[in-house]
Amino acid sequence: MSQILNDNEIKEFNKNGAIHLKGKFDIKWIEKLKVGINKAKINPSPRFTNHTKDEKLPSYLEDFWTWNLHEEFTDFVYNSPTAKIASELLEAKRINLVMDNWFFREAGSKSKPPFHHDISYFDFEGSMCVLWIPLEPVKKQDGIAWVKGSHLWNKLFLRTR
């Protein structure tokens, strides 16, 4: 399989701890994930969480470890470019799926997580790569935010509720 990322993208990721990659997933993968999330909302796992603070406002939902519960997610894990992209970013020969996690945050939702490092959720040492894949166009103020270079600070920000 040929390389997906170029050297400049990998350097930017190493420097900033995050990178905005466009056009790396065929639209069929995006559509497949939409179908999977719709199924998962109807038939959630025991780990499903509704983070919506005000039920009168648009929702903010989450579930994890669902990759093997819905065929769309299973296909994505095994056949999409996800693992290849992560291995190229980390310059690793082998990638392990530690966790899958989906969030459904409707436009206009006032519910959102505080700033945190994702690695604080996991009991392991080493490098990790999180891919945030929006399934529809997102305005900057509704998207995810990173602090460039914060992965190099040797300081961990834990999520609080």
List where the protein language model places each region:
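Non-heme Fe(II)-dependent double-stranded beta-helix
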Residues: 1-16, 21-115, 121-122
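Catalytic core of non-heme Fe(II) oxygenases with the double-stranded beta-helix
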Residues: 109-161
